[in-house]
Amino acid sequence: MALNFWKSSHCQQWIFDKTEIWKQRAEDMKIYNEEEYNRLNIFWANFITAVATEGAHSQANVGCKLRQQVIATAIIYFKRFYLRQSFRDMCPFLVASTALFLACKVEEHTTLSVSSFLKNTAIVLPKRWGVTFETTSTKNGVVYDSEFILVEILDCCLVVHHASRPMFELLEDLKQFTQQSTIANQPIKDLEAIEAQCQKVANDSLRCDVSLIFPPHVIGLSSIMVAMELMGRGEELEAWLVEVDTDFEKVTDCVEQIYKMYTLWKSFDEKEEVKKLMAKLPKPNQQPPPQQQHQHQQGYHL
């Protein structure tokens, strides 16, 4: 595993600028405008989270509750897949379920049955959004085929560096700074509450494109800044931020994108609007997406 982000496939192959991201989505942008696509970003993340966490309470009892890191990895797989493919190429509900299945393996979570994800999808979609999940088959082979396609489209780059790790390292640095610095008025209080709010913001950031644009440490620092502002405690960071060595132009951009996502999410009536967005979703091709033109090395890229 590539412990060094800067040498990883995540850094070298899966960080883009905003203009490039929208260019790669050109086929889907013939159907959706930018605001609609951003609403879809929120929906897909919510859907993947729901499939992973809510099915356990269903009458079919086929649910599964996954660790947040597994969910985050699955969401990023999904985002990466649809940078290289359009919704017409492969059913996004199937891709989302497959991304969860693959993320369980990569994050060394207990591997759940394929049928659990398919059944959870069929239960959660109509229950929460009034949308029916349709597929030509519910046999395990369907998901195993889609897993192969997903791995190939991702160039076998399956290790994802999340914002949580650098974020908690930065929070520890903040704690030490406020305890030792003569500049800070007093040690920071309610650290557990701050950590929880920061983690929530980091999780929520998966509902926009920051994971495709910024390194994890930028998202981590941005999550801290947004979380503290939401708690009404932003001024407590001022002295510490002066000491942080990073590209604050990128941090400012990331913070703005997270706030824009929250503004859009607040106005997003999912129960009503998702049906309209799904009505525009093109029917997937019968054939699987075209394979990459170049040859892939065997094994997973780290």
Swiss-Prot record:
Gene name as annotated: cic-1
Chief site of localization: nucleus
Location of region: Disordered: 281-302
A biological process term (GO) from this entry: positive regulation of transcription by RNA polymerase II
Coiled coil: none
Family the entry assigns: Belongs to the cyclin family. Cyclin C subfamily.
Protein name: Cyclin-C
Pfam families tied to this protein: Cyclin_N
Native species: Caenorhabditis elegans
Keywords recorded for this protein, A-Z: Activator, Cyclin, Developmental protein, Nucleus, Transcription, Transcription regulation
Localization annotation: Nucleus
Purpose: Component of the Mediator complex, a coactivator involved in regulated gene transcription of nearly all RNA polymerase II-dependent genes. Mediator functions as a bridge to convey information from gene-specific regulatory proteins to the basal RNA polymerase II transcription machinery. Mediator is recruited to promoters by direct interactions with regulatory proteins and serves as a scaffold for the assembly of a functional preinitiation complex with RNA polymerase II and the general transcription factors.
Listed InterPro entries: Cyclin-like_dom, Cyclin-like_sf, Cyclin/Ssn8, Cyclin_N
Domain Cyclin N-terminal: residue ranges: 46-152
Residue stretches of biased makeup (Low complexity): 292-302
Assembly notes: Component of the Mediator complex.
Gene Ontology MF annotations: cyclin-dependent protein serine/threonine kinase regulator activity
A GO CC term assigned to this protein in UniProt: nucleus
